[in-house]
C-alpha cells in the first residue's frame, strides 16, 4: 500500500515541481527525447503510412487500368463509328450518283415524252387542218355544184320547151335502162 501512496505523493510532487509538460522551445528540447518520439512515430506510422500509400497506389493503378480499358473501348467504338461513317458516306455517294442518274433519266424520259406529245399534237393539228381543208373544199364544191345545177336548170328551163324536155327525159331513161342491163 505504501507503493500506491508513494506513487500519489510522487505524482503530486512532480506536478508541483513543474518538470512534466511539453517544451515548445525546439533548441531547449532534448535530442534524445525527439529521436525517441520520431522513432516511435516511424515504427508505428510506417505500417499505417505504407498501407495508406499502398491503397492509394492500388487505387491509382486501378484507375489507370480502368482508364486504359475505357480508352481501348472508346478507340474501338471510334473505329466502328468511322467505319459506319465511311459506309454511310459511300451509300450517300451511291444514292447521290444514282439519284442524279435517275433524275437525268427522268429528265430525258420527260423530254422524250414531251417531244412525242408535240409530234402527236402536230400530227393531230395537220390532220385537223387537212380535214378542215377537205370540208371547205367539199363545201365549195357543193356550192359550185348547186350553183352550176341551178344555173343549168335555169338555162334548161328557159331554153327547153315541152317537146325537147320530153325527149331529154326519154333519152336519160333509155341511158339508165341500158346501164341497168349492163350491170345485171
From Swiss-Prot:
It is a single-pass membrane protein. One of its GO terms (cellular component) is chloroplast thylakoid membrane. This is ATP synthase subunit b, chloroplastic. Keywords: ATP synthesis, CF(0), Chloroplast, Hydrogen ion transport, Ion transport, Membrane, Plastid, Thylakoid, Transmembrane, Transmembrane helix, Transport. Belongs to the ATPase B chain family. InterPro entries: ATP_synth_b/b'su_bac/chlpt. The chain crosses the membrane at residues 27-49. In plastids the F-type ATPase is also known as CF(1)CF(0). F-type ATPases have 2 components, F(1) - the catalytic core - and F(0) - the membrane proton channel. F(1) has five subunits: alpha(3), beta(3), gamma(1), delta(1), epsilon(1). F(0) has four main subunits: a(1), b(1), b'(1) and c(10-14). The alpha and beta chains form an alternating ring which encloses part of the gamma chain. F(1) is attached to F(0) by a central stalk formed by the gamma and epsilon chains, while a peripheral stalk is formed by the delta, b and b' chains. Disulfide bonds: none annotated. It is found in: Plastid, Chloroplast thylakoid membrane. It comes from the Eukaryota. F(1)F(0) ATP synthase produces ATP from ADP in the presence of a proton or sodium gradient. F-type ATPases consist of two structural domains, F(1) containing the extramembraneous catalytic core and F(0) containing the membrane proton channel, linked together by a central stalk and a peripheral stalk. During catalysis, ATP synthesis in the catalytic domain of F(1) is coupled via a rotary mechanism of the central stalk subunits to proton translocation. Component of the F(0) channel, it forms part of the peripheral stalk, linking F(1) to F(0). Its main location: plastid. Pfam families: ATP-synt_B. The gene is atpF. GO terms for molecular function: proton-transporting ATP synthase activity, rotational mechanism. It comes from Chloranthus spicatus.
